[in-house]
């Protein structure tokens, strides 16, 4: 996944292309939606 950032969050997340939700099994705890992609934290 490509790196991305969410407003107000330190570090970087994983950008998932053309997804509306973060995939399970990666330990993501938060996300921000960037249509049509989603940024999932933490990386």
UniProtKB/Swiss-Prot annotation:
GO CC, one annotated term: nematocyst
Gene Ontology annotations of biological process type: regulation of blood pressure
Domain of life: Eukaryota
Transmembrane segments: none
Function: Blocks Kv3 voltage-gated potassium channels. Reduces blood pressure.
Pfam families: Defensin_4 (PF07936)
Name of the featured protein: Kappa-actitoxin-Avd4p
Leader sequence segment: none
Paired cysteines (S-S): 4-39, 6-32, 22-40
Cross-referenced Gene3D superfamilies: Anthopleurin-A
UniProt entry keywords in alphabetical sequence: Disulfide bond, Hypotensive agent, Ion channel impairing toxin, Nematocyst, Neurotoxin, Potassium channel impairing toxin, Secreted, Toxin, Voltage-gated potassium channel impairing toxin
Record-level Gene Ontology MF annotations: ion channel inhibitor activity; potassium channel regulator activity; toxin activity
Record family assignment: Belongs to the sea anemone type 3 (BDS) potassium channel toxin family.
